[in-house]
From Swiss-Prot:
One of its GO terms (molecular function) is structural constituent of ribosome. The keyword DNA damage does not apply. It comes from Bordetella avium (strain 197N). This is Small ribosomal subunit protein uS13. InterPro entries: Rbsml_uS13_C, Ribosomal_uS13, Ribosomal_uS13-like_H2TH, Ribosomal_uS13_bac-type, Ribosomal_uS13_CS. Located at the top of the head of the 30S subunit, it contacts several helices of the 16S rRNA. In the 70S ribosome it contacts the 23S rRNA (bridge B1a) and protein L5 of the 50S subunit (bridge B1b), connecting the 2 subunits; these bridges are implicated in subunit movement. Contacts the tRNAs in the A and P-sites. Pfam families: Ribosomal_S13.
Amino acid sequence: MARIAGINIPPQQHAEIGLTAIFGVGRTRARKICEAAGVPVTKKVKDLTDAELERIREHLGVFTVEGDLRREVQLSIKRLIDLGTYRGMRHKRGLPVRGQRTRTNARTRKGPRRAAASLKK
């Protein structure tokens, strides 16, 4: 099993798809990495040679991925919260950050509905 950037890459997948298991690598970036490393994107991960894996690791090292990227994102959000910006407050309150409506919808960000207290007379 190939291990790149601390992640076990699924051996049955094509190189391009397997690289997307790494946080911060999508299809486009995976394809560019494979092309730069001279690896066919349709080649299965289990069929990659050690030299090819090493070239992929080398080209992947240029990008911020996995733990470093997660840390960078968390620090950006923390900075927004510390500055007291509108976006920071939305993050803090667990509401949508990019201007979406919240009167209805926004359930992903807000979580499951809470039952409203009924006022009986």
